[in-house]
Structures are given as structure tokens and as C-alpha cells.
Amino acid sequence: TNPVDIMTRVTYELTGFNAAKVIGIGTTLDTARLRYLLGQYFEIDPRHMHAYVIGEHGDSEFVPWSQAMMAVNPVLDILEKYPDRYKMDDLDRISNDVRTAAYEIIKAKGSTYYGIGMAVCRIVRAIFNNENSVFTASVRLRGEYGLRNEVFIGNPCIINSGGANRILELSLTG
């Protein structure tokens, strides 16, 4: 339920579970939407788009474009190489579309529970099968980005049978 990051922290505090075992959906669904839209934009299979939506799920989430890759090529380099075809304004529109997608789905269907359910199933499968898969789940940061341990936000992390096993800190540059 939303606000997912706050509810994840409340769950952590009320249960007393190890922080690695308390995982919220975070921006997992937003990241999947982002990759899908980037795949359409760059005309490539979305599985080869490596980009993340991070931060608090909702209006303040963002895409660190400096870390976005199309296969092995940085997205920002592609924009620079093909300025007549690809534009930063288009990426900003895609980012905004991802941020507001839930509102559009709720307006049309009344809720977003199918997408969320699929994302939860995918995370549970990663835990049960000890997959070491990367998700932008809502997890407690451990000092990453200079933030205190009390903060739960959507951030790339490796999830396996131990839970959110490792937080992957992105280099955030202008």
C-alpha cells in the first residue's frame, strides 16, 4: 500500500525483523515501465535497457540518466551522438510519463493492483529461488548517498534468499 516507503519503514519498526528481510515494492514497477518506454523510444528490446527509477515512490522519484544504458552504450552518449533523432526533452517526458502512470491507470481502471501483484510475485520468486536479482525495491539504506539508516527508499539492490542482500549505490552526477 502507499506510501510504500513509509509503510515499509513502519513494518520494519513494528516487527523488529532484520532490515534486509523487510522489502517494499519501491520503484520496481516504475523501473519496469521506464525500461518498456525506453525500449519503444530507442526501438530496442526493453530487456536491453538498463535504467532505474529511484527515490521515494511517487512524485519525488527520479531517473539518474547518467547511469542509464542501452545495452553497453550510455543513453546520454546516444543523445549526443544522434542529436537530430534523440533528445533530452523526450527522456524527460518519458520520466514524467512513468511518474504519472499510476494516476492514469487508476483513472482508467480504478487501481493498479495487477501490476503491483506481478512485481511482488517477481520479488518473492527471487527470494524463494535465491536468484540474486536486482530490483529497485524499497529498502533501508545503510549510509548510501550519505543518508542515515532510518531511510527506506526505492534503490537498486540484490535480492536473494537472505532478502535485500546488497544495496547498489549509483553514482549520481549532474
Locate the predicted segments by residue.
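C-terminal substrate-binding/catalytic lobe of Rossmann-fold NAD(P)-dependent dehydrogenases
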Residues: L14-K21, D30-G174
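Rossmann-fold NAD(P)-binding glycine/threonine-rich loop
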Residues: T1-A20
